[in-house]
Amino acid sequence: MKIIARNKKALFDYSIIERFEAGIVLKGSEVVALRAGRANLKDSFVRIIKNEIFLLNSHISLLHTTHSFYKHEERGARKLLMHRKQIDKLLGKVSIEGYTIVALDLYFNTKNKVKATLALAKGKNLHDKRETLKKKQADLEAKAAMKNYK
């Protein structure tokens, strides 16, 4: 499993409830760009539109070798492939309980297919974010202290 892009900001801004794997519909030029590692999920989000699930605002850069006929839209909507039951479950959670769906990473699986890891998440408050930062800082200090005693 080769990870192409990771959304680090999502782990800071949201508390993850459940993770899902989804296939993604891409053009050939997009796959070539992903193999070169030219993807960014920083501002991306997932929406369910007419019982289909889409990854929006994800950035896949163009390669300089791509012919103008085959160029793709860099920030276009990309359809995600999931089972109907999974989509219905996500739709119920998002519409009723106030959760959101976040893209965590893009990767190539063992069969060289591009997959996306999605997460059902709930937004963190400012207090929760500060607590996360404090915990991270404490872990770093503990590691540094352990390193000195070796």
UniProtKB/Swiss-Prot annotation:
Q: Which domain of life is it from?
A: Bacteria
GO term, biological process aspect, one: trans-translation
Q: Where is the signal peptide?
A: none
- Alphabetical UniProt keywords: Cytoplasm, RNA-binding
Disulfide pairs here are: none
Q: Where in the cell is it found?
A: Cytoplasm
What is the predominant subcellular site recorded for this chain? cytoplasm
* CDD domains to which the protein is assigned, alphabetical: SmpB
**Gene3D superfamilies annotated for this entry?**
2.40.280.10
Question: Which Pfam family, any one, appears in the UniProt record?
Answer: SmpB
Give an example GO molecular function. RNA binding
* Bilayer-crossing regions: none
One GO cellular component this record assigns the protein to is: cytosol
NCBIfam families for this protein: PRK05422.1, smpB
The record's comment on protein family reads: Belongs to the SmpB family.
- Briefly state the protein's biological role: Required for rescue of stalled ribosomes mediated by trans-translation. Binds to transfer-messenger RNA (tmRNA), required for stable association of tmRNA with ribosomes. tmRNA and SmpB together mimic tRNA shape, replacing the anticodon stem-loop with SmpB. tmRNA is encoded by the ssrA gene; the 2 termini fold to resemble tRNA(Ala) and it encodes a 'tag peptide', a short internal open reading frame. During trans-translation Ala-aminoacylated tmRNA acts like a tRNA, entering the A-site of stalled ribosomes, displacing the stalled mRNA.
Name the record gives this protein: SsrA-binding protein
The UniProt gene name for this protein comes to smpB
